[in-house]
From Swiss-Prot:
Subunit comment: Component of the NuA3 histone acetyltransferase (HAT) complex. The NuA3 HAT complex has 2 functionally distinct forms that participate in transcription. The NuA3a HAT complex is composed of at least NTO1, SAS3, TAF14, YNG1 and EAF6. The NuA3b HAT complex contains an additional subunit, PDP3.
GO molecular function annotations of the record: chromatin binding; RNA polymerase II complex binding
GO BP annotation list: positive regulation of transcription elongation by RNA polymerase II
Protein name per its UniProtKB record: NuA3 HAT complex component PDP3
Predominant location category: nucleus
Function: Histone-binding component of the NuA3b histone acetyltransferase complex. Targets the NuA3b HAT complex via histone H3K36me3 to the coding regions of actively transcribed genes to coordinate transcription elongation. Stimulates elongation by RNA polymerase II in vitro.
Miscellaneous comment as given in the Swiss-Prot or TrEMBL entry: Present with 2610 molecules/cell in log phase SD medium.
Domain (PWWP) ranges: 7-68
A GO term from the CC aspect: cytosol
Amino acid sequence: MTKDIRTGDLVLCKVGSFPPWPAVVFPQRLLRNDVYRKRKSNCVAVCFFNDPTYYWEQPSRLKELDQDSIHNFILEHSKNANQRELVNAYKEAKNFDDFNVFLQEKFEEENRLSDLKAFEKSEGSKIVAGEDPFVGRTKVVNKRKKNSISIKEDPEDNQKSNEEESKPNIKPSKKKRPTANSGGKSNSGNKKKVKLDYSRRVEISQLFRRRIQRNLIQRETPPTEHEIKETHELLNRIYENSDTKRPFFDLKALRESKLHKLLKAIVNDPDLGEFHPLCKEILLSWADLITELKKEKLQALPTP
């Protein structure tokens, strides 16, 4: 980009072999800790549309994205099934008109809405577009941010911490992921478990999401051996309950918990490679559900 780049600007960002993808320039001080840790000099942070990931890039490598370009791309590629995800990203960019609303939706998606409200309260106003994208965190903001992650990751966490420990039927299985020889026996036990807890599937899905997110994403230091082990156990439990005649993690559970978006974020983090194979298998088993959720999201977007 040749012009002075600012937060809230729509841009095209190319990553590796992927086609240029619609994104918005994001304020550094509002980034998640795991993203901010990867901060690069002379780079700005962008947040992709229709994708949970962020990327650090030099402004000179970003291309300005205007509404005419968005309209023309959608018109030209809307019927191309091979570019459905990219077209959906352009559609989200087309409906982008209020940076603060975008931030609220993003923070809610990442279960950090309380953090955004804390930022705005400390600054005395809503976060708006047009800021310098190179400005990082101050020590005061960073300290408060660290405390909000370690003490109050989710508004419901403190209320449910004791409750979580008293739920033996939610506690992750000690069994490893089923193998070809033991799969039948393992699945039989899981079917009974799903039947018993099916009415609480949304609550349990949210619990799984919070635990995995706390272990791997919302943290300042590398996960401990215990947290890695617990995450493997949780993912195995999800895997075991994702391929049944009556899926435990159904459309309602994923819609409310956004567990699939968390797994996508893990897959997109190269530092979490040991979890990638299982996350990919789970996401593959949820492919139809994820497609349905995307359709719901598109239908909810305002028509031009």
